[in-house]
Amino acid sequence: MLKSISGGVGVASTERGGGGGGCGGGGAGGSASGSRSTSGSGRASCGLGSSSISSGLSAVCGFVTGASGGGGFERDRDRDRGLANISGGSTPAGILYCPACMAAANQQSPSQNSSPHHESFFLRSSFKSSKRNKARKSASTAGCLDAQHIRANLRMSMSSSMRSSRGNGGGGAASSSHPPGSSCSSGPGGSGCSMAYDAASNASSGSGSGSGKATSPGSYSCNALNVDFTSYTATHQWTRMLECAEFVGAKRSKHTVVAYKDAMFVFGGDNGKNMLNDLIRFGVKDKSWGRACATGTPPAPRYHHSAVVAGSSMFIFGGYTGDIHSNSNLTNKNDLFEYKFQSAMWVEWKFSGRQPVPRSAHGAAVYDNKMWIYAGYDGNARLNDMWTLNLTGENQWEEVDQLGDRPPTCCNFPVAVARDAMYVFSGQSGLQITNSLFEFHFKTRTWRRISNEPVLRGATSAPPSRRYGHTMVHHDRFLYVFGGSADSTLPNDLHCYDLDSQVWSVIQPEQNSDVPSGRVFHASAVICDAMYIFGGTVDNSVRRGDTYRFQFSSYPKCTLRDDFGKFFQDKQFCDIQFIVGAEEIRILAHIAFVAARSKYLRNKILAAREARQQQMEKVYGVGQVDALALNAGAGGDRGPMLEVRLANASPEAFEIILNYIYTDRIDLKDTYSKNIIILITDIYQLAGLFTMPRLAHGCIQYLDYKINKLNVLEALYNADKSNIKIIKDHCMQFIIKEENFTDVVMSSEFSDLDKPLLVEIIRKRLYPSKLVIDTSYEGNIGTTLEIDLCAFLESTGKDFCDISLVLEDHVIPAHKSVLSSRCTYFQGMFRSFMPPDNTVNIQIGEISPSLEAFHSLLRYIYYGETKMPPQDALYLFQAPCFYGLANNRLHAFCKYSLEHNITFENVLQTLEASDITKIYDIKEYALKLIVKDFAKVARLPKIAGLSRELLLEIIRAVADSHGEFLTRININTDI
């Protein structure tokens, strides 16, 4: 947590969860009970300075925050914005520099950085044992704080619980200031001095305040990393809970489930013989089933009704009632019942005026104290109308005037509410059933169909297949879809939709998960950070009464595509220029990204490089070429930029392809314009030329999605003219459809087509069976951004490396553009302090990581890989801060690795890494594990490579454990 440092006296508030203003203002510490909390603006940053800055750093920044003097800490005037200044003095207090300054310092003045009088505090944590922390509690100084006290007091928390990373960072972020003209600058998306620390990363809500996970006896607080080794449910873990006994509640389907506080309430449904109207309850804390107390008249037995929670009440609307055993009195309802949780009472609402028609299998949601009813089945037809009821006003229904791209009439679909919108996915729609996701924005009352085409959004997996009787819930920034009937199958995979990136993915469950069987007409609800599923129908119409729990995770989002896309748009550090089309339009890019994604363009770049080499040798002579090339590679302008000509390419199409190269997305504007169809045809041709099959596949998907009656003839004409058979066939297939043919033929553009095309359309219409769509391209949809960058890092990018990263005796070739796109540390270095020999010494704070750990970091930077052994995690959890990554996603996975992956097989590596990084709590845990499994650990080859000191510590730990064992034996013997 960000501990308080205020006034001229350094107060060491090290009590866990203790009080104190948050560093950077705006926050008070949590209670002293051990439950951590951070409140205030949500984001804060500190500008630290000292007048006694080493010459190397002062020459870089040319600025010191605060006035010289006592070296105390001084609150900024604008404290309500969450800013804090720490004024420097003659005493070397904590010094906070921007990534560029630190990069320069590490490269230019290593001796000064290592001096005890010039301790830089850029993103450093002091990893001391809990005993040492207790010894420092009483430490305070008057007038100045030395670097040791700074480290003890100011702990920059990058901690983010994997299940609770929802802080939005409400306040503005401060930045350490530099005067005009300083070489160290920060712009929107640049590096430089803007350093914001997420003070709400452990918050339980987006307000920037809340309570984090309480420190338990089995958990360890490693300053910037809180690791919990107590037993708990792993993320993405399916767990089978206690089944509901028959005497409590029958096995059922077509029921509803709602969550209220720490319980799940189940109402209605049918057991295969009778409809039900009982109300049963499952408590998630005591993990037990029981009947809920209820007074008043409950709703009649029913199924396919809806249930929502508003305030402290549950509302039941509509559904299908009657006697299914005798097949009598079967009817749909439009009644509304309220169940008040606090008084356990049923109340029926009465209405005057217009009401929704009776219905079942509809959707219901609550937003803005209103209940919203959508679609369903009225006994004769499916519906798509919408009604709303103010739950705090008069008992009056209002029909909603829906705008936008409305879904087709449907029933047996789920709804979920998130971000001022209601989401509807698939459902029964007869011939119109699709796997489309629709969004209804409550404030504008407008529908929007969300594109399912994965390549358009950069998705790595397809959306769920069309289905009905499934469930969908919202948690964090995701929608989760489970079960249902999908074309006569009952899948049990869990699909996830990311509301930020707008892509679908399939959740891979944790090993040893008890995954529920596929089912239909079940029900689900979210309680805290888990989804609970109850009941449903499985094979052969068998009703179930089982309950399953799925543990969510809330990792910070992967910013790989966003980082690369922004880097392309900013046009920083471009090292190649494409001259495109007859007009010779010049488009800047980066060699590394282009070479990674296209073999054709990679060969063009190598050929252009060879031609440039020969030209330079002609002009300057062989002896001068190497020096000029080095200057050009280092970012200087003394060497010519590489040029590649693409005379036959469309500049607009090529720019879109470049954006795809960086982001894996096809980003088109004005998507309903006729020119878009021509443009996508040009992109398809270039994708084939550049050997990018996934992009070509995306173009076909896009055409299927966007072709309509107004532009299909234009697309057909261009495909025929360009001899692109697959696009031509897709256009033909669209034209000859019964619902499209008449409108297309009667359009004015139809008569303008060439005679051979007209004849072909008529013949295809008369003999549609002869139209065969080539689907061979679907077997090879190419590689994703991650796969290409992985191959580029490991093999194909060796010829394009332009920077050397030195880690002790190891030289690791890399690519400046990739490093700069992801790390503000490297961005600032390459902009202002580029090493003349293209060599960068690697450290993370004061620690040199292991070679394996740094390779794990490179894999994360290049293609977002988060798998790592725990010993690598110990080195890397400071990396997001030190290197200026976009968020603390890597940090969260370091935490995950430490909590899940320490075993007797890697415990010695973990012990060694924790000793080097001085994370003594992890070291203590590793020693305990070694003692526990000493017979296995002692036979590992790694033990022979440990230092003498670590071997002695292991021997002492084993001896101590034997001493405790003998003591227990003596006590038992005496008794």
From Swiss-Prot:
Enumerate the PANTHER family for this protein.
LEUCINE-ZIPPER-LIKE TRANSCRIPTIONAL REGULATOR 1 (PTHR46376:SF1)
Spell out the Gly residues composition-biased ranges.
16-32
Q: What is this protein called?
A: Leucine-zipper-like transcriptional regulator 1 homolog
The gene is Lztr1
Q: Which residues form the BTB domain?
A: 574-670, 801-870
**Which UniProt keywords are given for this protein, alphabetically ordered?**
Kelch repeat, Repeat, Ubl conjugation pathway
The UniProt entry, under Pfam families, shows:
BTB (PF00651), Kelch_KLHDC2_KLHL20_DRC7 (PF24681)
Q: Does the keyword Heme apply?
A: no
Q: Spell out the InterPro entries in the cross-references.
A: BTB/POZ_dom, Kelch-typ_b-propeller, LZTR1/Attractin, SKP1/BTB/POZ_sf
Write out the GO biological process terms.
gamma-aminobutyric acid signaling pathway; negative regulation of Ras protein signal transduction; positive regulation of glycogen metabolic process; protein ubiquitination; sleep; triglyceride homeostasis
The effect of disrupting this gene, in the record's words, is:
Flies are viable but most wings show wing vein defects characterized by extra veins and vein tissue, which are caused by an increase of Ras-MAPK signaling. Decreases sleep with night-time sleep-fragmentation patterns, primarily during the second part of the night. RNAi-mediated knockdown in neurons of males results in reduced total sleep in combination with decreased locomotor activity, increased Ras-MAPK signaling and altered metabolism including reduced glycogen levels and increased levels of triglycerides.
